[in-house]
Amino acid sequence: MVRVLGWACSAASACACAVAVGLGACTAPPKDPMAVLTNPRSLSEQQLGAIKGLSAGARPIDTDAAREVRRLVFAPGIALGTRQAAFDLLAEDDRNGLREALETNIVRMDSFEFRRWVLEQIGARGMKDFTAVVVNSWAGAVPVWGPDERGRPEFAALAAMYGPDRVPDALFAVLNESHPTRQAGLRARTWEILIRLDERAALRDLVMKSSIRPDDAMLRDIKQLVDELGILPETREELLWLAKLRANASPEYWKAAGEALRAIPEDRKQGFELRGVPVALAARRHAPELLSRSREGLYDDLMVRLRTRDASKYSANFTGWETGPRRTEVLGLQRDEVRWIDLVACNLALALVDDPAVRARLFDMGDRDQQDRRTEYGGVIRIDDAGNWSVVEVRPRVTGSDLKFEAPQELFDQGYTALFHFHLHAQEFENGGYAGPHMGDFGYANSTRANCLVMTFVRRDTMNVDFYRHGPLVIDLGTVKRP
C-alpha cells in the first residue's frame, strides 16, 4: 500500500492519488495502452503513459491505435505534454493520417499554445508535405498573434522550410500545384494570404501572363474580371462571389458593369472591391453624376445631408461586448476610414429611403416584423434598368428567435447582384437601444463582403437607418418617417 497524506491507495491507483494531491505525475506505460486510450475517464498522465507504451511496442502502431492517438491531438481538455507526445508518435508512425487530420482541424484547436508548437515543429522538422496545414492555419485571424502577417508562426514555419525570402514562392507553388477542383478551398485561402502579404502585382501577373489550364475555373474567372472590370479580388468571400456571378449573371449584367466602371476615374478604382460593382451599376442608373464626384466632395455633401436627419442620435448598446477602442457610427469621426464607394453607397441609400414607395414597403415589413416574434425580417434592395428601386423580401432560413435573421441561400443568391442586403430591428416600436448593426451583423458583413443596411424602429412612425460593411465600418444615416 502507498499512504499519501492519510489517503490509502493501492499500487494500481497510486497514479491517480498522486495527481489528486498534486504530488506529480505517474507516466509508467500501462500493460494495455489501448484500454487507457479508449477509456474516457483516463487521466492525462495515464494517457501519456499509454503513448509511451505504444512507442515502446511494435512499430508502426496499428490503425486503431493511430486513431485513438489522433484523438488526443485534438480532443478538448488534453494536457499539452500529452498532445505533444501524441504528435511525435504520429509524425513517425501515421504521418499521412496526422497531416490529413491537421489540415481539417488545426483551425479548430482550442489551445493556441499547442497550435503554435505544432507549427514550430513543422518548420523545425522540415515537414514540407504539411505546407497545406500551415496555409489552413494562416487563413484565419488569431487575435492573440497580432495583425503582422510576417510575425505569425505560420510565416516562421514556411520560412524555416523554404527560406525567409521564399515564403511567397512557396505559397505560389501551392496555388499553382493544387488541384483546381478538389483543393479549391486551399487555393482560395492561399490567394487571400498572398494578398495579405501584398503580392497583388505578382498575382495580377499570374492571371494575366501565365497560361491557365482549362479546368482552372478560379484563375479563369479572375482573369476575366481583371480584363473586363479591372478588379483583382482579395478575399475568399470575393472569390466565391465572383464564381457565383460567372455562373449566374447575364451577359447584359457584365456589359452594364463594364460601362459603369469605365465611368469612374482611374484614381477612384485603386483597391476597388467586388461589392463596388452593384454600387456603380446603381449609381449609373439612378444618379450617374455620383460616379464623377471626388471622395472629398461626396464626404462633405453627405455630412451636410446628415445634419438634418438626426444622424447619430440613436445607436446600438454594446455594454458587455468587446468592440474595440474606436467603434463609432458617426461619419465625422471616420473620415480616414470611409472609402469612395462607401460614400456613393450612402448617397444611394438616402435616395432610396426618401422614396415614398420604398418607405411604405419598409414600414409594412417593419409592422409585420414587430408582430412576428419568431424572427427578424430582411431581404435585398435592387434598382432596375430604369432606375426604379425594388425591395425584395426574403424569408429566413429558420425561425425561432426574434433577435436574429437567419439568411437563407436565396438571399445570398439574390445578393450577388443586389445593391444592399438589409434586415430590420423591429422587436419594439421604441427600439433605439438596438439602432444599428450588432455583433452578429458585423460577422455577416465580414463573411459576405456585402453592402448592408439595417432599419430600426425608434418610434412607431420613425426608423433609424445604418449603412455597414466589413471592417466593420458603420455610418448612421439618420431617421426616416412613415409615409
Regions found by a protein language model. Give the residues of each.
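Short consensus segments that form the blades of beta-propeller domains
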Residues: 367-373
